[in-house]
Design a protein with these regions (language model features):
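Mature N-terminal segment immediately following signal peptide/propeptide cleavage
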Residues: 20-60, 67-70, 616-619
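Extracytoplasmic/lumenal domain signature
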Residues: 45-59, 84-104, 116, 130-162, ...
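Bacterial N-terminal signal peptides
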Residues: 6-16
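N-terminal pre-domain segments of enzymes
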Residues: 21-42, 360-391, 395, 554-595
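Periplasmic c-type cytochrome electron-transfer domains
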Residues: 380-395, 403-409, 416-417, 427-470, ...
């Protein structure tokens, strides 16, 4: 009787919420991105008995952000030097390996199957090519697109030969027979436009396009200069797309325009940048939009998955969509009309004094309590990690800086919180849809901006040295590297969890390739627009460049992993257009500002302000109140200095949650611990140390009535001032990560 009742209860919950309890067939678990699962066996009482059931080693030292897809008893993961691996979750054996997919969408893939189940596909982007793999065999589908792939550089209204980057790190969203896809064209001047496109999952044919930078005659065209559509870029969807399957509506958090921090060549509100955009998923027709930042100058693009919930307010039920942002704001709208559920007020903000710039005079501020700190004060400094002398210097520096979240970047320093990666970011939202509760991960992370002029950016001025560099050049390169590259790649060039080692990179690439990577970004690396060609050349010298770079034929081939390899490399990128430079000047005849300005991201000080640095938050949107908030993780360096309940610097970045029907919220954290919180009050009910830290979203599947939680633990731990540690509390060899799977004890 109890088992029957539990099964009936689970079935009713499943039907009521639309959650998927037994599989994880999409990035984020389901089209609605709620991460909500029905788990009759996992309760507040039983969770204390949760234990590691098994682990799949990635057999490499790569840090993955991959969210596994689990469907029909098969788990698909990225492992073994960026290979797609299919694993039978019952036998835990590899079914097939498609090896060496370097450049694949690193956060996840898309799964689709035909109604009769005979055609099952994995769809992903690799090096700007959309392609498909047979989910049963692991082999590329040659009939998809043109010779097995669709070149995403095409159909953007620009010369494909000049587009260096389009592929997004997030996989998109499947709806019926369509794959709705965003992009990541880069964040520098003259990046490609971020059109949203939908492709037929069987043929690869382009089904519809939505121009996020409107063209003449389209709605929003008048919010830009008349020729901006010819040169402006970004306004892309690199974050997480949410789908209301019943209504056929796709909700897209649209990114900021380029260049991020100076907009004299894009005067106006700049629709549809920084919008929550609702599109008809079948046709791409705009249903409604709301712009959360006008004329963005702060890289405040929304990226977190919009959450679909039912709110009880004013005596009625409202099907709502919720967008959490980097600023710590929470916006709530009626799903069908876009009407705000909780009030939003346009408030005056500071004007810009930078030549040519026209900051928008107001910004839309929601009435709901922010989840993040929004002002930097001299008294907010951390009690950890910095000396008294450093503290005094920081107090003076912050006291002189311009502050306030919407203070435009200027020729003097601005101290902004949340910064470019603060607040709530991708992976950081989940919900109990039926109860109107949204769960958020948040971090307080300031940015320090200071604009500078940049003029020597012509390709002809680049220094591609083929001889030894002098001492002055090496010293300039060392300084430029430490200021602009050291945080991610390490001052010693040995790498950090944020970026790979560069110890041998100087002998592998030349000035043109380094310049393209710096200006336009590559994979998870953002563009660094403030460096001149001279500085890039100096950095190359510091990295050991000077001799001729090795040709691709001289580079070592990627090793073939052990196991049932059925294919390798996917569909290779066509070798055409490899030497064509992206544009560095505006089209002829267009009136543009005489000067360009740049700044770095100012992200070198994640620990600077007093903790908590990272938090998990439960927001009750029926009442419009924060129900509870708790620190997320514990920084071990701070703990050594007596700190408790501090969170971790960068502690919520690239982390994710699972919400259960039984009142649990599981969350990963940068300290390499998986936590189970009580959904009602935030108490920690259980935790487990992982062999390595995590990046990316966890997943859930069910087998024989037991639910299994899958966590991608492949990233070295970092604490406080970027000290590193791995293998905490683990029997696994140090530095060996993998997918760790937890479950309640089974029959022995």
């Amino acid at each position: 009787m109890p088992k029957t009742f539990a099964a009936l209860t689970g079935a009713l919950l499943l039907a009521a919420t639309g959650a998927r309890a037994t599989e994880w067939p999409d990035y984020g678990g389901s089209p609605d991105q709620s991460k909500f699962v029905v788990t009759p066996d996992l309760t507040k009482k039983s969770v204390t008995r949760l234990e590691m059931a098994w682990m799949y080693s990635t057999d490499d030292e790569r840090a993955y952000q991959f969210n596994p897809v689990i469907v029909d008893g098969v788990m698909y993961v990225l492992a073994k030097n960026s290979s797609l691996v299919a694993i039978d979750v019952r036998t835990r054996k590899e079914l097939w390996i498609h090896a060496n997919l370097r450049g694949i969408t690193n956060r996840g893939i898309n799964f689709w199957k035909s109604r009769d189940g005979k055609d099952r596909r994995l769809l992903f982007v690799m090096d700007d090519l959309l392609q498909a793999i047979d989910a049963r065999t692991g082999k590329s589908i040659a009939t998809f697109g043109k010779d097995g792939a669709v070149d995403l550089r095409e159909d953007l209204g620009r010369d494909p030969a000049t587009i260096r980057r389009v592929a997004s790190s997030t996989p998109g969203r499947v709806f019926e027979n369509l794959l709705i896809l965003g992009s990541s064209p880069g964040e520098g001047y003259f990046s490609a436009p971020g059109d949203v496109r939908a492709y037929d999952v069987v043929t690869g044919k382009l089904a519809w396009t939505f121009h996020t930078i409107p063209r003449p005659g389209e709605f929003g065209y008048d919010t830009w200069p008349k020729d901006a559509w010819k040169y402006a870029g970004g306004v892309n969807v690199w974050g997480e797309i949410t789908l209301d399957e019943r209504r056929g509506i796709a909700y897209l958090p649209v990114s900021s325009p380029t260049y991020d921090y100076y907009g004299a060549d894009r005067i106006g509100m700049n629709l549809f940048s920084d919008c929550l955009l609702a599109l008809d998923a079948r046709t791409g027709k705009r249903l409604w939009h709301f712009q959360m930042v006008h004329h963005d100058l702060w890289d405040y693009d929304p990226t977190a998955a919009p959450q679909l919930i039912t709110v009880r307010k004013g005596g009625r039920k409202i099907d709502a969509v919720v967008q959490a942002t980097k600023q710590g704001y929470v916006y709530v709208f009626d799903r069908e009309t876009g009407k705000p559920v909780w009030p939003i007020e346009e408030r005056p903000v500071r004007a810009s004094d930078v030549p040519g710039e026209q900051a928008w005079p107001t910004q839309p501020i929601p009435s709901l309590e922010p989840t993040a700190r929004q002002v930097v004060e001299p008294d907010d400094l951390t009690p950890f990690f910095i000396t008294d002398a450093e503290r005094a210097a920081w107090r003076e520096r912050i006291g002189k800086a311009r502050t306030g979240m919407f203070s435009p970047p200027a020729m003097v320093e601005s101290a902004i919180i949340p910064g470019a990666v603060g607040g709530t970011n991708w992976g950081n939202t989940a919900a109990n849809p039926g109860k109107g509760i949204v769960y958020l991960l948040n971090q307080d992370f300031p940015s320090f901006y200071k604009l500078q002029e940049q003029s020597d950016r012509n390709v002809a001025g680049a220094r591609n040295r083929f001889g030894p560099a002098d001492a002055a050049t090496l010293e300039r390169g060392k300084k430029a590297y430490e200021q602009s590259c050291g945080m991610c790649h390490g001052v010693d060039r040995a790498g950090t969890p944020a970026g790979p080692s560069l110890l041998s990179i100087g002998t592998q690439i030349g000035m043109p390739q380094l310049r393209r990577t710096v200006l336009y970004g590559n994979g998870r690396m953002p563009p660094i627009g403030h460096l001149s060609d001279g500085q890039i050349g100096d950095i190359l010298a510091h990295l050991g460049g000077g001799g001729r770079p090795r040709r691709p034929a001289d580079m070592p081939a990627a090793p073939t992993p052990a196991g049932p390899v059925v294919a390798t490399g996917g569909i290779a990128r066509p070798p055409v257009t490899a030497t064509v430079e992206a544009p560095q000047e505006y089209p002829a005849g267009i009136e543009v500002p005489p000067q360009r300005y740049y700044t770095d991201y100012g992200l070198g000080f994640p620990y600077l302000l007093a903790p908590p640095w990272s938090q998990i938050i439960a927001y009750d949107l029926n009442r419009g109140v924060i129900r509870w908030r708790r620190p997320l993780g514990q920084d071990l360096d701070a703990a050594k200095e007596g700190g408790k309940n501090n969170g971790v610097p960068r502690g919520s970045q690239r982390q994710g949650m699972i919400v259960t029907s039984t009142g649990l919220v599981f969350s990963t954290a940068r300290d390499g611990v998986l936590y189970a919180f009580d959904a009602e009050n935030g108490d920690v009910l259980w935790s487990a140390k992982l062999p390595m830290a995590t990046e990316g979203l966890p997943a859930v599947y069910e087998l024989d009535g037991r639910h299994y939680i899958v966590v991608n633990a492949t990233t070295p731990h970092t604490w406080g001032l970027n000290s590193r540690e791995s293998g905490i509390g683990s029997a696994e060899p140090l530095g060996k990560g993998g997918y760790v799977i937890f479950a309640l004890p089974g029959k022995r």
